[in-house]
Amino acid sequence: TQRYAVPMFEELANSNAPVRLHSPNGLHVREMTPETALLMKRAGMVTVRLSLETSSAWRAVKDFSGKVSADEFNNAVDALFSAGYTSRDVGAYILVGLPGQSKEGVNDTVEFAAGCGVQVKPALFSPVPGTVEFERAVEAGMIRENDDPVLQNNTLRTIDFWDDNGDGYNEFRRIINAANSKNL
């Protein structure tokens, strides 16, 4: 952040260029300080997406989401709101369909993110070869190690997480919509 993003934001903020920036990928919450949030706002960043992934305790124990603690996430959100961003501007990506993840764990993460005042943006887990989560997905029988990557993609595995008749997915969408409507 300090090496690339901050100098870029400083240059944009000082130029008064009429830009509207959006972060389509989740930003790392540890890098979100009050100073950085204010600089982003001055530079023209209008849509901010944070990387939460999961707030489940079992993931933290397994060293998956050690990069984001609840306090760090709250601090990042507070920094953004203090800089002038609103709930409409800030969203958090959460992962759905991680090996061993329960629907209750996903719902807890939705509640946590919404409770922080941000929009919840679910993303389906897609294992990347060579990562710990890929190995966990193989061990859990979600994928086979030597399968074509297209067969490991989240698009083909979506039904694995929901019940077969689609009611589970529809209920999840209802939960997401209800959570997000609180922060409009």
Regions from the language model: what does each represent?
Residues 94-95, 123:
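Conserved beta-strand segments of the P-loop GTPase G domain that flank and frequently precede/overlap
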